[in-house]
């Protein structure tokens, strides 16, 4: 049975509101970019994800780090809208399924890695995922590993973007003390940089709930030296936006084309406006 989101998306797309939303977004400026966040892309969903990539490639430019920085400086890649595709949680499918398909289309992925998940012995990774709110499908592999390996992370960094997604996949709530924030943010950044032998300038907050954001975590992210930081509060990216408050919109590999169109339409941005403004005020550092 279709979910409520699928049914709503189908109705809105049938009414043409998805196309109207894209046109309205385009009228607000010469170019705009939307960041999407994915999680697990299991092998049985590879064809679905490939269809989504084909849909994106027909309509959007792919944005990497240099493209995004140029946009912030007022130099969009082209007159077409852009997309940033991010993949959270350091899952094995990101190397096995996602990266080869992205490369087939000539697209760049942004992979957000929680350090401790990669460090966890394979036989303990399912338990770690359950204890730290990392969702995954029931993959059938020849071994117990469900996380990226460090070799995977290094390989991804060669053609894609690797960002920090905390140490333990922890929501950076107001309840965390200074020691916990040190572990989750600067320590995780240093470890990724040591493994990759290159700077890691990109961060992604864990969780989209309002309580998952805090002023002190925002200051630590800024002080640690990150210059791009992703949240999940639904808004397009435009020149002049705060680079440590980049909003994302959730899409998953199993979402129908109607759901994808709905998520891209900007209609959800309106519903998230009040929350987004509260979170942005809370996490303003510059």
Language-model features, listed with the residues they occupy:
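C-terminal active-site subregion of NodB/CE4 polysaccharide deacetylases
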Residues: 1-86, 92, 175-286
């Amino acid at each position: 049975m279709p979910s409520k989101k699928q049914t709503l998306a189908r109705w809105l797309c049938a009414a043409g509101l998805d196309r109207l939303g894209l046109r309205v977004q385009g009228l607000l400026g010469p170019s705009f970019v939307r960041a999407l966040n994915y999680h697990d892309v299991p092998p049985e969903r590879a064809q679905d994800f490939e269809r989504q990539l084909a849909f994106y490639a027909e309509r959007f430019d792919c944005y990497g780090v240099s493209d995004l920085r140029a946009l912030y400086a007022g130099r969009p890649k082209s007159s077409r809208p852009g997309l940033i595709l991010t993949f959270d949680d350091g899952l094995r499918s990101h190397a096995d399924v996602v990266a080869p398909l992205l490369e087939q289309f000539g697209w760049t992925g942004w992979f957000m890695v929680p350090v401790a998940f990669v460090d966890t012995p394979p036989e303990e990774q399912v338990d770690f995922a359950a204890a730290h709110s990392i969702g995954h499908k029931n993959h059938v592999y020849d071994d117990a590993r469900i996380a990226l390996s460090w070799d995977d992370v290094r390989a991804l960094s060669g053609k894609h973007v690797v960002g920090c997604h905390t140490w333990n996949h922890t929501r950076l709530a107001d309840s965390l003390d200074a020691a916990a924030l040190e572990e989750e943010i600067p320590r995780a950044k240093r470890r990724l940089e040591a493994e990759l032998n290159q700077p890691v300038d990109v961060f992604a907050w864990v969780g989209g709930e309002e309580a998952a954001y805090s002023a002190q975590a925002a200051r630590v992210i800024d002080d640690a030296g990150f210059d791009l930081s992703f949240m999940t509060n639904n808004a397009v990216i435009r020149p002049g936006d705060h680079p440590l408050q980049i909003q994302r919109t959730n899409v998953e590999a199993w979402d129908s084309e109607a759901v994808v169109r709905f998520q891209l339409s900007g209609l959800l941005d309106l519903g998230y406006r009040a929350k987004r403004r509260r979170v942005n005020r809370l996490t303003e550092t510059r």
